[in-house]
Structure formats: structure tokens, C-alpha cells
Amino acid sequence: PHVVNRWREQPGPGAGAWFDLGPHLVDQALRLFGRPLAVTARCLCLRKHSEATDNFHVLLHYPACEVVLHGSTFAGGPNIRFQVQGTGGSFVKYGLDPQEERLKAGVQPDNAQWAMENEAAFGTLHTETTCEAIPTESGGYQTFYVQLAAAIDGGGRAPVAVAEALTGIALIELAEESSRRGRTLACSSIL
């Protein structure tokens, strides 16, 4: 892939694939696993003429597991969205949430099919004895913005607590520092 003239591919603070996709992945990891003990990251510029991160591989170290956050502009074809491996089996999910593409196609959020995925996009749970398709739960980005508007108007709670947002930002910056320094960094310094 070629470098394109857009904000995330230009050098500077907050640019690159890690700052574009990373916050979403970090948020999901923090929601599922909490704050890690340490982080090891490699944020790289692999494309010719690239001045902003276009490939990242981040390990979040927890007491009983490691979480891998990975993104690359080189990934072609069907990409793994989630892969969870545990003692009871493995879960694999390909593809992206359908909401953005549906919105571009003119489908409105109040449509019953808004965030529903077809069976081909379901995740698969593999155990020692079975292989089972797991339907994706329906979501709605618009709920976040409704909650945010209510919080701004003073009539509701923010969809994300300030402390959670600050922890996410600190972890993103710590991962970038880990990559720059070439070593694992403890998360004790973040909120």
C-alpha cells in the first residue's frame, strides 16, 4: 500500500495507525481485562516514504494472560478481528462491524437490520470436540452519542468515565514510549 495524503499518514503528534486504530483496541482490552501490569510495543514505519506508524504489535502483560493488539496497513484479504485462546478452546472472528458501511449505503440506525451481521460474519468457537458459529450481538454507535449529549446537557452520566479515558490515553502513550525505547515498560506509572 502507498502512503496517502491524509492526517493519519503524516508525521506529527497523534498520527499513524497506532493513534488511529489503537485507541479502539486499547479501550476494548481495558474493558475486558482491566489495566495491564506492563506493555511491550513495536510501532513501525514499514512502507517506503512512510513517516507515520503503519504497523504496530503491542503486548499487554497481565498476571494470567497476554493480550496482543495488532494493526497493519499491509493486511490484505480477510483479517482476523478477534482471536481469543484459552484452556476451553479458541474463538476467532473475522471482519468489521457493519455499521459504518451501512451508514455509507444510506441505511439509517433505526432500521432493524442496522447492526445485525449475516451468518458468514459470525465468530467461530473451536473446542476439543466442537466447532460452533457464534452470532454477533447487535450494537449501535449512536447510543454512545446519545449518552454523551445527555451528559453534556447535565441530564446523564458520561458513556466513558474520565478516569477510564485518561488510563486509555496513558496506555497508548506508554506503548509508544515502549516502542521508542525498545523495551517492556511497567504500567505502574499510569492512572
Describe the predicted segments one by one.
Residues 35, 63-66, 78, 89-90, ...:
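Short acidic/polar mixed-charge low-complexity motifs
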Residues 1-49, 57, 182:
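Predominantly a Rossmann-like dinucleotide-binding segment in NAD(P)-dependent oxidoreductases
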Residues 147-191:
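C-terminal helix-rich "cap/oligomerization" subdomain common to oxidoreductases
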Residues 23, 70-78:
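Glycine-rich phosphate/pyrophosphate-binding beta-alpha loops
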